[in-house]
Amino acid sequence: MSETITEVTRAEYCAIACADIFSGAGEIMASPMATLPLIGARLARLTTEPDLLITDGEALIFADTPAVGAKAPIEGWMPFRKVFDVVASGRRHVVMGANQIDRHGNQNLSAFGPLQQPTRQMFGVRGAPGNTINHPTSYWVGKHTSRVFCDTVDIVSGVGYDQIDPENPAYRFHHLHRVVSNLGVFDFGGPDHTFRALSLHPGVTADQVADNTSFEVAGLADAGVTREPTDEELRLIREVLDPRSLRDREVSV
């Protein structure tokens, strides 16, 4: 990276990590569910994955790759009913959020507390069960805390690896690909498909991750550092995809 480029922010490292989620994806539908995953998906489309299909988040397929919140020429129609067809085909990669994730990848975005008498209602399970069963799923967590990365989720919305019956063909497409947080990049490549650290963002220590995770993180001592963006990637993030710096509202460090 050249000396003319200003210091890379934590949010920009997160954007790069989210873009790398789609590395090698090819011609599939990218469905990012928050600002930084959206920047990441569009960055991937402008660099390594030009065949990614992206939408406005409602019902229109973009012909171009606009900035966050901007309009662009439309090349197709993707109403909700067609999304179900894409989900069932497996040609989609969703990046969802999570209110809770456990070491096996079970995700909760439904409610806190007992199933029959929750103490706080959230979104409901939404599309999480179908997403996790049918196609690659990743998660984005903007604030990595022990409340989110917990021992046991209150309600399973997205299906984790300990729920899988390997003999049942219904689970054959289950694949939890990545978890990106404001502290690092993770997957479920630990023992018995448990949570594993792949890289920590520059300035983040292993102790910080351990202190903000309720369970042991596999591979934490050996995790590398999240890669540096290229000059072109930084230009695209700052000038093309997010000129209003919305990314810094999601991750401010």
UniProtKB/Swiss-Prot annotation:
Q: What class of enzyme is it?
A: lyase
The record's InterPro entries line, in alphabetical order, gives: NagB/RpiA_transferase-like
| BP-aspect Gene Ontology terms | cholesterol catabolic process
Enzyme Commission (EC) number = 4.1.99.-
This protein's pathway reads:
Steroid metabolism; cholesterol degradation
> Which catalysed reactions does the entry list for this protein?
(3E)-2-(2-carboxylatoethyl)-3-methyl-6-oxocyclohex-1-ene-1-carboxyl-CoA + H2O = 6-methyl-3,7-dioxodecanedioyl-CoA
Q: Source organism's superkingdom?
A: Bacteria
Q: What's the reported outcome of changing residue 58 to A?
A: 20% decrease in activity
- Describe its function: Involved in the final steps of cholesterol and steroid degradation. Opens the last steroid ring of cholesterol by catalyzing the hydrolysis of (3E)-2-(2-carboxylatoethyl)-3-methyl-6-oxocyclohex-1-ene-1-carboxyl-CoA (COCHEA-CoA) to 6-methyl-3,7-dioxodecanedioyl-CoA (MeDODA-CoA).
Q: What is this protein called?
A: Cholesterol ring-cleaving hydrolase IpdB subunit
The organism is: Rhodococcus jostii (strain RHA1)
